[in-house]
C-alpha cells in the first residue's frame, strides 16, 4: 500500500481498531488513493452486545434533561473543531459552501435536539403516555402507561452525500431517547465521518458503549439484531428494501426506518410570472438546489 494512503480506524467496543484496509478511498478531485477502510474480522455480534450491556444500561438511567445537556456539550465541543472538518471535507469533492449544510447543519441538529429535550420533555428517564386510568371502582387500582428506552442498539446506515449531518442528526435522536448507536457511514466519504467521530470520542462526553463506528462493510451485523434494536437506513430504495426484508429483521419484528431515493420538488404557481418576487425566489432556490453538492441534496 502506498505510504500516502492513511488507514482509517473503526471504533469497536471502546477501542480504536485500524481498518483491515481492503477498500481504497480516492480524493474526489485528484483521483489519488488517500485512505483505506474495511471491517474484515470484526466481531459484529460483540459490538451489539457491548452497546446493549454498556451504553444502553447507562443511557437509560439518565433523564431526558441529562441527555439533552450531553447533546449540547457535544455540539459545543464539535463547534470548536469545525475548521478541521472543513479541511478534510474538500477531499470529498465539496466546497466550503457545499459542506456548510453538512458540517454546521449537523452540529446544529445537536443543538436543536438538546433544546427540545430540555423544553419539551420531562426531567425523568421516562415519558408519561396519557393520563392515569381508573381500573377499580374506588380508585384502589390505577394504570399508567409510560414510554421508556428500548433495551437494544440503534444501527445507522448512512448515505455518502452527508457524512456529518447524516450521522449527527441520527445520533441526536437516539441518544436523547436513551439508546446507544453503531454508525455505518457510506464508504465513499467515511473518512470525514471518522474524523468527526474521533472528536466525539476524544471529548469524553458520551458514556462508554454509547457510540461505535464502522468504516467499511456492515458484515453480518443485521443477522444479530433482535426486537429491541432499531435500524435506520438512508440510501437507495433497492438496497433499503433488500435490508428491510432480511429474515432476521422480519422474524424479530425489528423497527426499520428507511429514507430512500428522496427527491426535492419546486412548484411555481401560474400567477408567479417573470418579474414577480415569487418568480425570482423560485429561480434562486432552483439554482441553489442544482448547484449545492452538485444537486446531491435530499432535504
What do these predicted ranges mean?
Residues 1-139:
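N-terminal Rossmann-like NAD(P)+-binding subdomain of aldehyde/semialdehyde dehydrogenases
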Residues 31, 67, 178, 211, ...:
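Residue-level signal for inorganic ion chemistry
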Amino acid at each position: 500500500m502506498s505510504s500516502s494512503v492513511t488507514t482509517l480506524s473503526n471504533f469497536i467496543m471502546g477501542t480504536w481498531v485500524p481498518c483491515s484496509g481492503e477498500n481504497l478511498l480516492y480524493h474526489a478531485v485528484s483521483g489519488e488513493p488517500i485512505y483505506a477502510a474495511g471491517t474484515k474480522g470484526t466481531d459484529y455480534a460483540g459490538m451489539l452486545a457491548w452497546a446493549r450491556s454498556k451504553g444502553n444500561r447507562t443511557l437509560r438511567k439518565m433523564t431526558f434533561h441529562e441527555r439533552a445537556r450531553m447533546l449540547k456539550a457535544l455540539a459545543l465541543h464539535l463547534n470548536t473543531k469545525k475548521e478541521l472538518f472543513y479541511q478534510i471535507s474538500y477531499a470529498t469533492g465539496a466546497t466550503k459552501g457545499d459542506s456548510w449544510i453538512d458540517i454546521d447543519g449537523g452540529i446544529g441538529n445537536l443543538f436543536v435536539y438538546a433544546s427540545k429535550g430540555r423544553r419539551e420533555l420531562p426531567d425523568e428517564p421516562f415519558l408519561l403516555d396519557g393520563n392515569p386510568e381508573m381500573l377499580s371502582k374506588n380508585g384502589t387500582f390505577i394504570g399508567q402507561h409510560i414510554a421508556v428506552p428500548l433495551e437494544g442498539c440503534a444501527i445507522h446506515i448512512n448515505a455518502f452525500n452527508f457524512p456529518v449531518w447524516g450521522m449527527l442528526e441520527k445520533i441526536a435522536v437516539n441518544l436523547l431517547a436513551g439508546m446507544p448507536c453503531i454508525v455505518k457511514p457510506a464508504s465513499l466519504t467515511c473518512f470525514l465521518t471518522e474524523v468527526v467521530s474521533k472528536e466525539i470520542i476524544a471529548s469524553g462526553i458520551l458514556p462508554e458503549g454509547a457510540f461505535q463506528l464502522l468504516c467499511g462493510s456492515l458484515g453480518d451485523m443485521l443477522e444479530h439484531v433482535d426486537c429491541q434494536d432499531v435500524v435506520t437506513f438512508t440510501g437507495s430504495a433497492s438496497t433499503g428494501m433488500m435490508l428491510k426484508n432480511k429474515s432476521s429483521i422480519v422474524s424479530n419484528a425489528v423497527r426499520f426506518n428507511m429514507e430512500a431515493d428522496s427527491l426535492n420538488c419546486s412548484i411555481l404557481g401560474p400567477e408567479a410570472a417573470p418579474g414577480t418576487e415569487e418568480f425570482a425566489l423560485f429561480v434562486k432556490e432552483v439554482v441553489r438546489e442544482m448547484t449545492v453538492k452538485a444537486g446531491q441534496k435530499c432535504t
